[in-house]
Amino acid sequence: SLKMDCPTVYRKGSWWLMTYLLFDGRGYETWLAKSKDLLNWKTEGRLMSFSDDSTIWDANQKAGYNALTNSAWGGNYQLEKYRGKYWMSYFGGNQKGYESGPLSIGMAYTEKDPATAHQWQRLDQPILTSSDQLVRWWENKKQFKSTVIWDKKLTTGYPFVMYYNAN
């Protein structure tokens, strides 16, 4: 049986869109659905699928979360482009099963319409791993769900901030 997890909702024009994860026993894939009313959803298709090449670091786990969503109170909830691309952070891994093996955070992007189901391009290597030199005790096993925000006022001193779950 399939298990659905971690919806991320955003807006494009008159549509609400939702990326979500499906777990089928092998691992996570990232999917897209559309709605006019936030109640009735239509599945559009996959955004990040399993890889045929089992040697790729994220072959069996691709759990994606849209980045740079305009989340201002009363804002438009649309995805924002950076350098002409829409972005998505995701946790990935190459072992089969429920969150099995090392899980790291990667980034994916597209120049196409994010409201249309298509495969997003992924960076070749993860951007955060549990074996990074500066890893701390609470993130030295697995890294999970992440959210990337655009701090245009540089409140934090950086243009982008990632919140993520790890153990």
List each model region and its residues:
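Beta-rich carbohydrate-recognition and catalytic domains
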Residues: 1-6, 10-64, 68-141, 150-167
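Non-cytosolic head/periplasmic domains of membrane-anchored proteins
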Residues: 145-146
